[in-house]
Design a protein with these regions (language model features):
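Class I S-adenosyl-L-methionine
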Residues: 205-239
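Class I SAM-dependent methyltransferase SAM/SAH-binding core
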Residues: 81, 88-138
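Conserved alpha-helix/loop element of class I SAM-dependent methyltransferases that forms part
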Residues: 54-76
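A short glycine-rich, Lys/Arg-flanked "PGG" loop and its adjoining helix->strand segment in the class I
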Residues: 164-175
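Conserved beta-strand signature within the Rossmann-like core of class I S-adenosyl-L-methionine
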Residues: 176-184
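A short SAM/SAH-binding and catalytic strip from SAM-dependent methyltransferases
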Residues: 147-162
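A short acidic, Gly/Pro-enriched loop at the edge of an enzyme's catalytic core
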Residues: 137-150
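N-terminal auxiliary segments of SAM/dcSAM-dependent transferases
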Residues: 1-31
Length: 239
């Protein structure tokens, strides 16, 4: 795998529109061109996990397993929802930690295809859909899985899923269900009424969430080596 990706170069943001990856002399793509990246087995892991040192999957999975231990829950009897499943890294980690079943969901069909190709058998099911829409059928579908927890590594915030997606995801969980999510700290500013910080504070005030931990950590580095920090949120759903 290393030899296959020897010529890949990371390119810093030359303009305001983000980070780039030169796959070859003739092809340069945006770092978030997920359909293109997912099309090549192992490419996402090489770029994001290895080169950019992304830690969110590990931090989210370890946090979730820590939460269920703290709550004296038995992972071997749990079905957990993984929001923004991508190629299945998080699902693989929590399954490795003893969780019986993981149901994946992602907005991109290419993510599901890559996961089924590279990590077959990790998910009990993998759905394609958008949790941010209040009119969608995805929450109804998810209620059929008797979910007992939620995990998400970097799927909420920014150009990804808005606070409404988190609220819709919480709606499919029973009271007392553990959750572990990682969110870019830029979207956790409580002074932004439309941000995740304000949304989480409101959910806590309403009794919809009980916080267990909130921790800042190094999510990854940029293509030019600068740090990007996220927050890990561990909580349980209210009743």
């Amino acid at each position: 795998m290393t030899a296959t990706f020897d010529n890949i170069r990371l390119i810093g943001p030359p303009t305001a529109d983000g980070e780039y990856v030169a796959l070859s002399e003739h092809e340069t793509i945006h770092l978030h061109d997920y359909p293109r990246i997912y099309a090549v087995p192992g490419l996402y892991e090489h770029i994001v996990q290895e080169r950019l040192q992304c830690r969110s999957p590990q931090v989210a999975a370890e946090g979730f397993l820590r939460a269920i231990t703290r709550l004296a829950m038995e992972p071997s009897s749990m079905t957990v929802l993984d929001v923004g499943s991508g190629t299945g890294l998080v699902g693989e980690l929590v399954r490795g930690g003893g969780v019986a079943r993981v149901v994946g969901v992602d907005a991109l069909a290419e993510a599901r295809a890559a996961c089924l190709r590279d990590r077959p058998g990790v998910y009990a099911d993998y759905l394609i859909g958008d949790l941010s829409s209040d009119s969608g059928t995805l929450p109804t579908q998810l209620r059929g899985y008797a979910l007992g927890g939620l995990i998400s590594a970097g799927a909420f915030g920014g150009t990804h899923a808005p606070p409404s997606a988190l609220i819709n995801a919480l709606s499919v969980l029973p009271a007392g269900a553990p959750l572990a999510i990682t969110i870019d700290e830029r979207w956790m500013d409580g002074s932004d009424p439309d941000g995740f910080g304000a949304a989480i504070e409101q959910l806590v005030a309403q009794g919809a969430l009980t916080l267990l931990e909130r921790e800042r950590f190094l999510h990854r580095i940029t293509t030019t080596g600068e740090p990007i920090f996220y927050e890990l949120i561990l909580a349980t759903t209210g009743g």
